[in-house]
Design a protein with these regions (language model features):
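Hydrophobic, helix-rich cores of sensory/ligand-binding and other regulatory modules
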Residues: 1-166
Length: 166
């Protein structure tokens, strides 16, 4: 009985690790289209659901410990049961793949980004910034939303330095 439970835990860990690497490769546009369809079926991910990428970055004090804290805090905020996914693509930023309500949910996405920023501030991370891309309808387009969020964050450093949600 104990061996079966341990085996189940190992399987769940491997599935999460596979999902994490799949999402990272998807964000960075490192997958072929056929691989995307194959892996989404294996990992039980819905392909045609509206999603948006949010990029959370600590503006000052970009130590790894600080960003790791943000990752853990955001994973705790979102939880495993929601349709959202949290990962870290580089050492300075945390990525949230948020399951949007519809393709035209700009106000809801902005409110969610404000909520993420407020939650981080309540948890003691005061220098965070949140940028988000457009809502995309398919999983294969998620890298476009990520690139838009990344560009919004880069441009905001120059033109909108006072804004925390971009």
């Amino acid at each position: 009985m104990a061996a079966y439970q341990i085996q189940s835990l190992v399987g769940a860990f491997k599935e999460h690790y596979d999902k994490d690497s799949f999402m990272k490769n998807l964000l960075l546009d490192n997958l072929l289209l056929i691989d995307i369809y194959e892996r989404e079926k294996q990992l039980h991910i819905q392909a045609n659901a509206p999603r948006v990428v949010m990029l959370v970055e600590t503006q000052y004090g970009r130590s790894r410990d600080r960003d790791r804290d943000a990752l853990v805090i955001l994973q705790g905020m979102i939880g495993p049961g929601s349709g959202d996914f949290v990962t870290q693509v580089d050492e300075n930023s945390v990525v949230i793949i948020h399951a949007a309500e519809s393709d035209h949910a700009d106000e809801a996405v902005a409110r969610y980004a404000d909520g993420v920023l407020n939650y981080l501030q309540e948890e003691g991370i005061q220098d965070a910034r949140v940028a988000y891309g457009t809502v995309v309808g398919e999983l294969k387009e998620i890298s476009h939303s990520y690139k838009e969020a990344r560009m919004a964050l880069d441009v905001s450093r120059i033109f909108f330095e006072e804004k925390d949600v971009i």
